Structures are given as structure tokens and as C-alpha cells.
Amino acid sequence: MYGNGPVFKAEGTSFRDQPYAEQLPQGLWTTGLCDCHEDAHICVQTAIMPCVSFAQNVEIVNRGTIPCMNAGLIHLALGFIGCSWLYAFPNRSRLREHFALPEEPCRDFLVHLFCTPCAICQESRELKNRGADPSIGWLSNVEKWSREKVTPPIVVPGMIR
């Protein structure tokens, strides 16, 4: 078992036993907070519909346990009263934990309080750079990883033997 969820298998072996599609260093962000220009699609989507980009990230970071639609609606509702950052910053913390990323450029709640769109874009790019495509959802990513016989990029440090 991996955490509380199932072990993902490809031809009888656990994904934990397979190499990563791309070995990216833990402890380093692959993209900066203000590097929105690196992915125009994510940038435009987040500028127009931040709740959609955020919800896609939530589904991946939480390994499909929080449906995209639910996360998006909650983010949208909280956005109307200016509090979406309260729901968003814990997801950034989870993402950082998965990849042992530093809390930069400041505390997660401050990043989301003062720059939610930039934070959402950075988190989307980080997932994409590490092999997860937030736009296709968790199950489609799992199917893709199974076909390619690679380890899912979502790994909690200390959980692998």
C-alpha cells in the first residue's frame, strides 16, 4: 500500500519499483513564481478561470480523492468573498511536501494571499514539469503512467523503501 491508497500497478509491478519518467531534483522548484510566460495556456486559463486551474491541481495533488468539480466550486464560492486563498494555500503545502520543495519566496499562505494567480500557475507548471498533466485529471494520468510504465510523480518523501 502507498499511504492510504492503492498501489498502482503495471504488468505486475508497483510503480514504486519503476524509474521516474524524468528524474527531477527534489528540493528545487522547476519554475519560478513569476514565470507565468513559460506556459501560455496555463497562464491564460488561470487569468480567465483561476478556479479551473486550481481545481485541476487539487485533483492531481490529492491523487483523485478530491474531485476537480468540487474543488473548483469551493474555490469559486470563496473567491466571491475574497477568501479563496484560505482554501488554496494548503494545496500548495501538500504539493511542496510531495516534492520536498522549499517554502519560497515566502510562506504558502502569503504567496496565495498576495499572488493567488501566480501561485496557481506555478503549481500547474510544477506538476506538468514533473510528469503530471493537470488538465486531463488524475485517472487519465494514472492510465498514461501505466501505458508508459513509469512511476507517478506524486511521491511523499519518506514513503518509498
UniProtKB/Swiss-Prot annotation:
It is a single-pass membrane protein. GO terms for cellular component: membrane. The gene is PCR12. InterPro entries: PLAC_motif_containing. May be involved in heavy metals transport. The keyword Cell wall biogenesis/degradation does not apply. Pfam families: PLAC8. It comes from the Eukaryota. Its main location: membrane. The chain crosses the membrane at residues 71-89. Keywords: Membrane, Transmembrane, Transmembrane helix. This is Protein PLANT CADMIUM RESISTANCE 12. Belongs to the cornifelin family. It is found in: Membrane. It comes from Arabidopsis thaliana (Mouse-ear cress).
